[in-house]
């Protein structure tokens, strides 16, 4: 997807909050924006294609 491994790491090494869709660091346990504990890793591939 990204041209460089560094760029890909920057884009995909995050967790997404299931409540507010905020981006959080991989080491996060709760969302930085709303405090929700339900975080998922960002998808590496597009959905439905």
Swiss-Prot record:
Entry keyword Ribosomal protein: yes
Q: Which GO terms describe its molecular function?
A: structural constituent of ribosome
The Gene Ontology biological process terms listed for this entry are: translation
Keyword annotations: Ribonucleoprotein, Ribosomal protein
Gene Ontology, cellular component aspect: ribonucleoprotein complex; ribosome
Which family does the entry's similarity section mention?
Answer: Belongs to the eukaryotic ribosomal protein eL40 family.
By its UniProt entry, which PANTHER family does this protein fall under? 50S RIBOSOMAL PROTEIN L40E, LARGE RIBOSOMAL SUBUNIT PROTEIN EL40
For this entry, the protein name equals Large ribosomal subunit protein eL40
From what organism does this protein derive?
Answer: Archaeoglobus fulgidus (strain ATCC 49558 / DSM 4304 / JCM 9628 / NBRC 100126 / VC-16)
**Gene behind this protein:** rpl40e
């Amino acid at each position: 997807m990204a041209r460089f491994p560094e760029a890909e790491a920057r884009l995909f090494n995050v967790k997404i909050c299931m409540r507010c869709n905020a981006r959080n660091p991989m080491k996060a346990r709760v969302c930085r924006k709303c405090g929700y504990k339900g975080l998922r890793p960002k998808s590496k591939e597009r959905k439905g294609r």
